[in-house]
Amino acid sequence: MEKPSFSLAVVMQRRPSASRWQSEFWEPLSVLAGYQGAGEPRLLVEDAGMQQWLHPGFKLELHRDEAEGYYLNVSAPNPRVFVFWRLEEERQGGEADGKAGGRARGVPLQVTVSFNEAGRWLDGGHSVDGVAMPPEVFAWTGEYVEKNYRPEPRKRIKPRSFVHPKDRVG
């Protein structure tokens, strides 16, 4: 059975930094829902040291075991699409040895709408940022959650005063 999926493109932004230790700052800016294109990243905007790059070809897949993470996201005040990304050196044109040179570029690697999966990426020390969830993705994810998420029933914990003294721990 094929997993539900949604095509996306990620827009990464580079802007100058006022920091003495860092000359530029990269971050995911947005995702474009339903973007069907593929291929190499392309420059969309360049203005006063700021650049925006379109990275096409992402497929947002939903998995039943992540339904709780989707529920937590769509029920939050500001639902997000989480982008797992890293800095990679730009390759110099014509280098046969494949060595990197020049500046670093922010490159998105994966996307998710699960709070839990994004948290695991962060726990692993990766760069993960959330961007606003497009309405189409919100509706699609919400529908999936309604069909597939059932919260675990809560177990009542007896207050310690009602537990027999020989069964009390501590």
Task: Cite the ranges covered by each PLM segment.
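Amphipathic alpha-helical interface segments used for dimerization/assembly
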Residues: 137-149
